[in-house]
Each structure stands twice: as C-alpha cells, then as structure tokens.
Amino acid sequence: MKRVGAHVSIAGGVENAPLNATAIGAKAFALFTRNQRQWHSPPLQKASVDAFRRHCEAGGFDARHILPHDSYLINLGNPDPDKLERSRKAFIEEMERAETLGLVLLNFHPGSHLNAIGEEECLGLIADSINLAIKATDRVTAVIENTAGQGTNLGSRFEHLRAIIDRIEDRSRIGVCLDTCHLFASGYDLGTAEAAERTFEEFDRTVGMQYLKGMHLNDALRPLGSRLDRHACIGKGMIGIEGFRYIMQSPLFEEIPLILETPDSEGWKEEIELLYSLE
C-alpha cells in the first residue's frame, strides 16, 4: 500500500498530529515533536504521549508510517566545536523524544560546512554526530534527507548520502528520505516516468533502495538543477504529474511514508486524493 500523508500541525499538543492527519485522509504523517525554531522545549508530558499513542492507534498509523522531523537549528556538520556540541545534544534529545512517543524514525537535514571546512571533513562530522546519537539511544533510525543544494548545505548528491552511510557503525539504524523537489532542484530529473526511473536507478546504484525509509512529495517551483528549495503543489510545478504517477505506480515505494510539504495546507486532502487517483 502507498502511505500518502502530509506534515501536519502539532498546535495545541503533539497528540493533535494524528487527528489532523486523519482529517485529511492521510495514511501516514510527519510532524515536529517540539517548536522547530527554538533550542529548548519542555519535556513531553505523559498525558500528551498517551493521547498521541491512542490517537495513532485509532487512526491506524503504524510507527513506520510516521516521520518526525528534527529542529531546523541543528547542524550536525557545524565547523564550530561549541555549536557542533549544541547541535549534537539537541539531536540526541530529538531522538529521545521520538522514542518517548513510540516512534522509530527521525528525519533530519545532514548539515552545512558554512565555507569553514571542506566537504569531506563536514561529511565526517555529520557521520560522527549520527554515530553518537545512535549509541545514546535505543531504536530510532536516523533518516537523512537529501537537500536542494542551496548554499553550503551538503546532501544534494547521492554520493554525499553514501559517504555518510559508509561511516555509520550501525547501518540498521540509518536511512534516507528523498524529497522530490530537492531531487529536481539538485539536477535529478523526475519530469517523466523514464526520467524518474533513471533517477531512482541511480539512487539504488549509489546508495541502495534498502535505505529508503520515506519520501517528501513536492512539486518544484523552479527548473531542473536550480539548486533552489521552492516547493509547488503536486502537478502545478516544473516536475509535473508524470513523475508522481511513476512513484504512485511503482512497487519501490510501498509501505513508506510519502509526505506532502506543498504550500497550500488547505488543499492537502485534495492532493492526497489526486495522488491516490494516479495508482
């Protein structure tokens, strides 16, 4: 089964995320487990955790189909030792929050070298950060998201993802989330079924489909290779509908969260219906 959903709000409490997902007909969802633009957040309360788990069960959401995202402030490749330590501590806390909620995945952006160190050194720092977090926690899989190639962010090339994975000590707890807008922005074509097939074949050769734990389904506002992270609604951007038809019809993407992050949250229910109509 294809598990299409969206990145839903936790306004009023994390326990509202599965309710918001159910309301739009989602079969998966993503969420922040805290304010993503602050370093410090209060611990999760037992009542919220219990309600979250109860609502997930009622909505039929298995932990494999829920893709929490870490804070945007975290940079696991930060060249500044003090800031790197702060990011590592926050990342471990994010992993712990996911575990508290009974979740098994944590989606994150790899990191940025900030023009202060080279790519290889930064990739090494990112991998070291992940290894530390895996050792400090019990079961959550760290899910690296590919990036659009903006600025000094790493992760836009499949080779970056492979280089990180190669340095991970426990590869049973590392995975990848592919964002379609980011793929397109970094030069991986999805505009036709044939182009999409070539892109995912390249991903399989370079990284391995066994590492794919989720996807973000977003059309792209800017042309192929723009290196700009600008999302568009499904079928209304430069990717177009055929790449998404390929994803919805391919057996490669069964039983992983396929998460909308498109600009119009009011239209997510209709976009989910549109995607299922492509099967």
UniProtKB/Swiss-Prot annotation:
Its EC number is 3.1.21.2
Q: Which Pfam families match?
A: AP_endonuc_2 (PF01261)
Recorded hits in SMART domains, A to Z, give: AP2Ec
The entry's Zn(2+) 1-binding residues are 69, 109, 145
InterPro entries found in the cross-reference section: AP_endonuc_2 (IPR001719), AP_endonuc_F2_Zn_BS (IPR018246), Xyl_isomerase-like_sf (IPR036237), Xyl_isomerase-like_TIM-brl (IPR013022)
- Chain residues that bind Zn(2+) 3: 182, 229, 231
- The secretion signal range is none
Record-linked Gene3D superfamilies: Divalent-metal-dependent TIM barrel enzymes
Q: What does this protein do?
A: Endonuclease IV plays a role in DNA repair. It cleaves phosphodiester bonds at apurinic or apyrimidinic (AP) sites, generating a 3'-hydroxyl group and a 5'-terminal sugar phosphate.
Q: What's the family?
A: Belongs to the AP endonuclease 2 family.
The protein in question is named: Probable endonuclease 4
Which organism is this protein's natural source?
Chlorobium phaeovibrioides (strain DSM 265 / 1930) (Prosthecochloris vibrioformis (strain DSM 265))
